[in-house]
A protein has these predicted regions:
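Auxiliary Fe-S-binding modules of radical SAM enzymes
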Residues: 1-160
């Protein structure tokens, strides 16, 4: 398990329940952080949750957000603007950068970012077609490798 997403329920016209309180979300995020190994990230979706109010409970990942696409799972809830995400990340000390859907520890060593100081997951975690895409000698492979190194085009970190 590389991450656990603590996603609140957002009621709609077909539901009869209420959105959980901020305090309930804070307790849930904190319990996830305590219960999970340190190597497992705790994520909250910033378009569905009061992210700023949850960061100090153990959130270390803001999720797969996009400045150019909608949230396909929750299309009624737009992603926060990139500037807002930068501000939220800065306030929490959580780096904001473009990343692959797989965390560094699961990447083969040759694809990990320089300075990776975590514990590599044992074994092989990526299917051959994914490794082939990362290895590709074309613009796509180059882009994937750049994102893995954290020097992708959407790098907005301040020196991570």
């Amino acid at each position: 398990v590389q991450e656990v997403i603590v996603q609140n329920v957002v009621p709609n016209e077909r539901s009869s329940f209420e959105k959980p309180s901020v305090e309930t979300m804070r307790r849930t995020v904190a319990m996830a952080r305590v219960a999970l190994p340190e190597s497992v990230s705790v994520q909250v979706p910033p378009n569905l949750s009061p992210t700023r109010e949850l960061l100090d409970c153990g959130v270390d990942d803001l999720g797969g957000v996009s400045p150019v696409t909608d949230d396909y799972i929750n299309p009624d809830y737009a992603w926060p603007a990139l500037a807002e995400l930068v501000d939220v990340a800065d306030c929490a000390g959580v780096p904001l950068y473009e990343r692959l859907p797989v965390y560094d520890r699961y990447l083969p060593e040759r694809f990990r970012r320089p300075g990776f100081d975590g514990d590599a997951a044992p074994g092989s975690w990526l299917a051959d077609p994914i490794v082939d895409a990362l290895d590709a000698d074309d613009a796509h492979g180059e882009r994937f490798r750049g994102v893995a190194r954290r020097d992708g085009p959407l790098d907005v970190s301040a020196g991570d």
